[in-house]
Swiss-Prot record:
UniProt similarity note: Belongs to the universal ribosomal protein uL2 family.
Source lineage: Bacteria, Pseudomonadati, Acidobacteriota, Terriglobia, Bryobacterales
Quaternary structure note: Part of the 50S ribosomal subunit. Forms a bridge to the 30S subunit in the 70S ribosome.
Name of the featured protein: Large ribosomal subunit protein uL2
Polar residues: compositionally biased ranges: 7-19
SMART domains, alphabetized: Ribosomal_L2 (SM01383), Ribosomal_L2_C (SM01382)
Keyword Cytoplasm: no
Record organism: Solibacter usitatus (strain Ellin6076)
GO cellular component entries: large ribosomal subunit
Example of a GO biological process term: cytoplasmic translation
Protein purpose: One of the primary rRNA binding proteins. Required for association of the 30S and 50S subunits to form the 70S ribosome, for tRNA binding and peptide bond formation. It has been suggested to have peptidyltransferase activity; this is somewhat controversial. Makes several contacts with the 16S rRNA in the 70S ribosome.
This protein's UniProt keywords: Ribonucleoprotein, Ribosomal protein, RNA-binding, rRNA-binding
UniProt GO molecular function: rRNA binding; structural constituent of ribosome; transferase activity
Length: 276
């Protein structure tokens, strides 16, 4: 979808861009697939802030998306492409021949009227979901399971894709969007193709208010705080912090590796590539 810009009627309007919604064919969601969504404001059950800079934003209804793709052997027709406020990609409404309706992530190139299917006998076509053992090496996939039957957890955001590099015994080697190469059980399901709405990464919000609509509150720098609030705080006048970047709790940040999960280390062949 093309990026849409606006006439500069205000200073922020000058830089504001949106992804064109010409691909969306249905404005209201399927009622049977909508649930209410409670907002936390970044607080846990005791009322304390556990995720900073979260609050406010437009009210959203949750669309129940099928990440498991476990309806094997039953063909479905794409009935509509819809907007989902809870994720960066579009969602596709499927009408199965047995009458059931489900939402899935819309792969790039999936259009209304196309037929798709899940299961080990499905063809290698965009939108079809198969176990990794039935997908040829080199295929682009998304919505990949980490555990068989749990539902897709990797490569789900707009424009994301992973590549099936090879299979060794009962494990498949995948190159993930981060550059990481990871082993996954060949029984895990994956969907063929790249997630749609590829131009999402090129959008410029243009103004702070648009970030507030998304439920994000202002992010404060540590150097602008007092010493009681942040390790970078204090000093006479403007300072650079005086030390290597750390979090408010003293943990080194900006490139410092904090991963500590020995249980799953054996599944990772190469760590994700560094940002340049």
């Amino acid at each position: 979808m093309p990026i849409k810009s606006y006439r500069p009627t205000t200073p922020t309007r000058r830089f504001q861009t949106v992804v064109s919604r010409e691909d969306i064919t249905k404005q209201t969601p399927e009622k049977s697939l909508v649930e209410s969504k409670k907002r936390s404001g970044g607080r846990n059950s005791t009322g304390r802030v556990t995720s900073r800079f979260i609050g406010g934003g437009a009210k959203k209804a949750y669309r129940v998306v099928d990440f498991k793709r476990d309806k094997a052997g039953i063909p479905a027709v794409v009935a509509a492409i819809e907007y989902d406020p809870n994720r960066s990609s579009r969602i596709a409404l499927l009408n199965y021949v047995d009458g059931e309706k489900r939402y899935i992530l819309q792969p790039d190139g999936l259009k209304v009227g196309m037929k798709i299917m899940s299961g080990p006998n499905a063809d290698i076509l965009i939108g079809n979901a198969l176990p990794l053992k039935n997908i040829p090496a080199g295929t682009i996939v998304h919505n990949i399971e980490l555990k068989p039957g749990k539902g897709g957890q990797m490569a789900r955001s707009a424009g994301s894709q992973a590549q099936l590099v090879s299979r060794e015994g009962g494990l498949a080697l995948l190159k993930l969007p981060s550059g990481e190469i990871r082993r996954v059980a060949v029984e895990c399901m994956a969907t063929v193709g790249q997630v749609g709405n590829v131009d999402h990464e090129n959008v410029s919000l243009g103004k702070a208010g648009r970030k507030r609509w998304m439920g994000k509150t202002p992010h404060n720098r540590g150097v602008s705080m007092n010493p009681v609030d942040h390790p970078h705080g204090g000093g006479e006048g403007k300072t650079s912090g005086g030390r290597h970047p750390v979090t408010p709790w003293g943990q080194p940040t900006r490139g410092f590796k904090t991963r500590n999960n020995k249980r799953t280390d054996k599944w990772i062949v190469n760590r994700k590539s560094k940002k340049r």
